[in-house]
Amino acid sequence: MIVEKPCRVVAVVSGGPDSTCYTALWLKRGCDVHALSFLYGQKAVVEVERAQLLLRRLDGIAAERGWGRVVEHRVVDLSSLGELWRGTQLTDPSVSVEQSYTPTVVVPIRNVVMAAVATAYAYTVGRNAGAKTYVILGSHYDDIKPREDTWEPLYPDCSPECVEAMQTAFRICHFRGERGVEIWTPSREGLRKSQLLKMCHQEVGDLIYDTWSCYKSGEAHCGSCESCKNRHAAFIEAGLPDCTAYLTPPGPGFEKRGQFYLHISCKKQ
């Protein structure tokens, strides 16, 4: 893609590797970042705390390298939505977090809700800014693998088609002269999770190990949920050591070090 300069980005940053790495990519592209993290009643509320830490560190790296800067980080409290999003593993206390993918892991059109808020803010920060404004989310190409039963995307609101439809709708819903906001995701750029991790590690190094993927909040990644397993698989596929601390091994090749399990590829002490 061609990024118009000067540029600013409203980034939805969860604290996970996908949104963190994609934000780093846009900082490297020279765009200033207005970061938004969302409280939406999720069980893994620790991810927002990680986002705050990671964005501070990313801004330090960006300053050293002459990239764009993290202008601000706002936490948007939509926690009351957790009462509406019932029956999903991520928000409903009565629904257990599964060890493999089932449709109940999907929070219905969560990305659409967040993208709508982010785009509304983008129209605000972009007004009279004299810069091209983008909205970015971390959904990647692996999120849209087909389900085995219906062949629909695993996570429908992560698809490029959904992203492009949102962009069109949000433009139609605003004034003609201010319709320049674009919405981008790794999936729209054709990037897989492992590709994001590899690119990110080349730029920010071990910072990627401080991201949070687990669907639960705990002292370390649980290692048993689908997201933990996807995280580990992506590190291995990217040819990177997985230095994530897990409570249980998400795959083969792990050894216990102290309280946690680390993969044998990790040489960190």
Curated annotation (Swiss-Prot):
Pathway: Purine metabolism; 7-cyano-7-deazaguanine biosynthesis. Its cofactor is Zn(2+). It catalyses: 7-carboxy-7-deazaguanine + NH4(+) + ATP = 7-cyano-7-deazaguanine + ADP + phosphate + H2O + H(+). ATP binds at V13, S14, G15, G16, P17, D18, S19, T20, C21, Y22, T23. Pfam families: QueC. It comes from the Archaea. Its EC number is 6.3.4.20. CDD domains: QueC-like. It is an enzyme of class 6 (ligase). Zn(2+) binds at C214, C222, C225, C228. Binds 1 zinc ion per subunit. GO terms for molecular function: ATP binding; ligase activity, forming carbon-nitrogen bonds; zinc ion binding. Keywords: ATP-binding, Ligase, Metal-binding, Nucleotide-binding, Zinc. Belongs to the QueC family. HAMAP family: QueC. PANTHER family: 7-CYANO-7-DEAZAGUANINE SYNTHASE (PTHR42914:SF1). Catalyzes the ATP-dependent conversion of 7-carboxy-7-deazaguanine (CDG) to 7-cyano-7-deazaguanine (preQ(0)). This is 7-cyano-7-deazaguanine synthase. The gene is queC.
